[in-house]
Amino acid sequence: AVQLLNLDSTNMEPSHWKLMVHAIWEHYDDFDGFVIAHGTDTLAYTASLLALALSKVEIPVFLVSSQLPLNQEGANGNENFRRSVELICAGIHSGVYVVYRNEDGRCFLHHGGHLVSSGDYSNDFYSRDAVCLGEVSKVMEGECSRAAMHLNQWTEELKRDKICSQRNGNGIDLSRMGELKSDVLCIEPYVGLNYQQIVLNKEIRAVIHGLYHSATACIGGTNEEQKSEYSMLPFLMRCREARIPVIVTPCPNEAAYASGVWMMEAGAVPVYGMTKEMVYVKTLLAGVLGYPNEKLCSFLKEDVCGE
């Protein structure tokens, strides 16, 4: 075991991700798989980052969390850990995964690049193609889980599941990953968002702008409203003049509303099918790779790890 970091995951910084990636590459030949203990708060971000940064690693990497301290009744960390080790021992394909038991007792295997942060007032995690590994009411020392009894059958089924197709992407070699800079600004839409209060300094390399569930943001209805401080359109013009790309997400598919079309015409770059956590960390990694704005946009649409 290697204690690389000992901190609340709330205090995670980009430099900590670099340490994780380098540590795994450093010990790559020593193990058949890795299990990383991680807090729940920033789990989805770390899982997404590692799914990309370790896309060339040929062994499985699991992130394990617990919603409660391990010595408290009802904590799911013990089961999450056990199932992760079982899957590694059974020969699951290489890739980055998260095993997590939700409050309803069902345990799921997640593609690290598809994991979404827990919702408000919830300890559960979801992803679009999660595989249910079954139900276990309680994991005790010395007691085999139902998972272990059907392990070989599980693993063969999982190998055919798209969640284990992370190697189908192009992959990127980040064994010598450089510094991750905090030069990506994230904005979430809300009623009353005043774009004139947003300062675009020279250190901002890209902006990621969230959207409402219908893939829209405020752009105003009338010509006058489209020029107001609440409209995204003047902000897009400012970013274009400063040569700062604005990436909009989540976009399930092509814009269905006129506001979405106007955003694209004003220069917004849509990214389809990825979580906001993945879009953010992928944009960060584009900076490490030294990609200019033009290459950033094409890189976001490139499949690296099945994201």
Residue ranges: model-predicted function:
Residues 36-44, 104-105, 212-216, 252-255:
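Gly/Ser/Thr-rich loops at beta-strand to alpha-helix junctions
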Residues 92-119, 295-307:
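Internal, active-site/partner-interface "lid" segment
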Residues 36-59, 220-235:
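Short Gly/Thr/Asp-enriched flexible loops that form oxyanion-binding sites at enzyme active sites
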Residues 1-26, 254:
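ATP/NTP phosphate-donor binding region
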Residues 47-79, 83-97, 240-250:
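Short, acidic/small-residue loops that bind anionic groups at enzyme active sites
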Residues 211-307:
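C-terminal non-catalytic interaction/assembly regions of soluble proteins
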Residues 32-34, 206:
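Structural motif
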Residues 108-221, 228:
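Accessory alpha-helical/coil subdomains and C-terminal extensions
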